[in-house]
């Protein structure tokens, strides 16, 4: 329960960062983010893995420029669109 709270706070933190930055700046802030291959590659989605607990799916670069970021927390029902 406590870990899920931490994960939700971390998700909200990344959502707040996305309002003022882009993927490249987040990468430079957190270091290199390992890419994980998934079945949504045809949709130009990249899945990044944080700390073995949180998995966040970003939309395409065009979605980032338009401000329509989508975040999916794999371990819980919390969704950001």
Curated annotation (Swiss-Prot):
Distribution of this protein across tissues and organs: Expressed in fetal brain.
Domain of life, source organism: Eukaryota
UniProt protein name: Putative uncharacterized protein encoded by LINC00158
Organism: Homo sapiens
